[in-house]
Amino acid sequence: RLSELFEQARVRRQAAAPLAAIGPAGVGGVAFVVLCLAGALASDRRDAELRLLLARGGSRAGIVGRLLGEGAVTVLPAAAAAAALAVLLLPTPRLAPALLSAAAVTLLALLAFPVRAAVLLAPPRPAARWRRPVGELLVLTVTGAAVLEVRRRGISPAGSDVDPLLVAAPLLLALCGGLLLARLQPVVTGWLARAAGRGSGLIGFLGLARAARGSGSSGARARGRSGPSVLPLVALLLAITTGGFGAAVLQSVDSARLGVVRLTVGGDAAISAPGNSPLPDGLAKAAGELPGVRTSVPLWIDHDSFVLGTAQGTTQVTLVVAEPAAYAELSRTLGCGAFDPALLAGGGAGPADAPVPALFSADLARQATPGTYVLRAGSGGELRARVAGVVDCTPAQPGPGGVTVVLPAGPATALIHGVDRPNRWFGLGSPAADRLRALVSATRPAAGAAAPAAAPGAGRYPTAQALPVDEAYPVRTSAEAVAELAADPLQRSAQRLFWASVAAAAGFALLAVLLTLMRNVPERAALLARLRTMGLRRRQGVALILAEALPHTLAAALGGALVAAAAVALLGPAMDLSTLVGASVPTGVRLTAGPVLIPAVGLAALVAAAVLVEAATSGRRQITTELRAGDQR
């Protein structure tokens, strides 16, 4: 038995590992972009110094070695302290993954600046126009292969370890979106700049024109190299795609978990009586009047009824008697056997022996023959019924293979013994479990009081008065069942890891935008100072910086939302969420607007606020400082 539990835990952990790895992979991708951007910023700032060293006889290898030494002074102690802090705060018996991750980050941080400097100091070569298209085509090919593999095998194939290609599929889609956006954004911004140029104002035209061609004309750009303007777009797209895809997965998990729980409970709340014993008088009505109850469905269930006249002669069924409109709403909300309540109407008209309309389960309908049937209840009494509709399941008995018959409460009440006293109550809404239990305790018959007459055949079940209140009339709510399912450590850890990854990716994306702004601070401050001498007001300077920086942010937010939606549409149908839900559910992630738009709008607002603060700070620089003699910017 213990070995089976260990094997079950191993299989669940193996199934959840790829889903939990998507978030950290997104953080790693954004962090990689940020480190590359930091290396580009450092190399641009020290470009003149490095070229001077090369002109004075220094070799490229010597300069790169010097930069490695400079970086080691700060990177190695910081990496060691960070790794030690991680081990102390989050102790684990297996240190190898943590140490390997720390070593990879350290190596990347140490090499980003020297590698960028080595590229800048390389002898100029003829521009190869095919280099960028070939690289983009390679990324597109790898992305297509990853998406096809995910659609074919799923993100977490049974019995296999984490496949990096499958886990990286959302990130590759974001990378493709970033490359496409880097092609389209300058063109669209250029159109907007030309449209703004036809107006009377100059602020919008200048800002959009600088955004279209890329701000800054010094450093690497002045020598014909393209600046790292695509990196902030990629960072924002990675963060938004990771956040949107992760939020869609988590919402689908919550939705699927609620759906499973609702089917298990029978709604958002349920009260049942033991056996065929009825609920206390007035309990169903009082429960329906509690705050938070949207729909009240009292019903009567009998598992010992029989249908006479089927292909097998006599078939034992579960008989459900409920008010048609309320039961139809319950079925529609639960997604279990939805039907039109008009199908069960008309059973009360006509002679007393007229057949009552009934809903047959699919299994029973396959045994049915044309005509009417005799329905004999286990509590006593019988009636004639006709098939008014077929349902594949019903909330009163949602399990597969159930043979059920649903009757309307009105016509059946006078023909079946005890059906006027419901023995089940289902509710929709958000009722409080403690209020329901208090209501059950208040309406339960006293120990010395006469018990209500039970239906015939209920004697083999324990009476309600002989049981504790929690066992006599058990109360179940979907909120408690969802909390119980979500309390699983594996699911809770995966969910927390996902949200932590989304927050970290957003932080790194914001850092990427700030690094981009810092890269152009000297040139932008000099431009503002010169424009101030020509009558530019401080408020107009802030507007100019916003007009220059916000098109990138808005384009990244819109593109990230579209890429996140594409990732959910392409990869979602292949994701099995059963491990995260805690129960077997159909494969697939639902695409909804909320989880995709909220990360995009939130990150765009955060970046816009950071740009506004930087713009207001840059506008306070002194003109005399920026226009000093000998300024080389």
Regions found by a protein language model. Give the residues of each.
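Hydrophobic secondary-structure segments that place a key small or acidic residue at a functional site
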Residues: 339-411
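Membrane transport/envelope proteins' first extracytoplasmic loop
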Residues: 1-31, 99, 155-167, 180, ...
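Short cytosolic juxtamembrane segments of multi-pass membrane proteins
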Residues: 122-128, 619-633
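Hydrophobic alpha-helical segments
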Residues: 51-54, 58-185
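Short helix-loop junctions at transmembrane helix boundaries
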Residues: 71, 80-99, 150-165, 561-602, ...
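Juxtamembrane segments of multi-pass membrane proteins
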Residues: 155-173, 177-346
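Interfacial "coupling" helices/loops that link adjacent transmembrane helices in transporter permeases
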Residues: 33-72, 511-554
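Alpha-helical transmembrane segments of integral membrane proteins
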Residues: 20-37, 78, 104, 139, ...
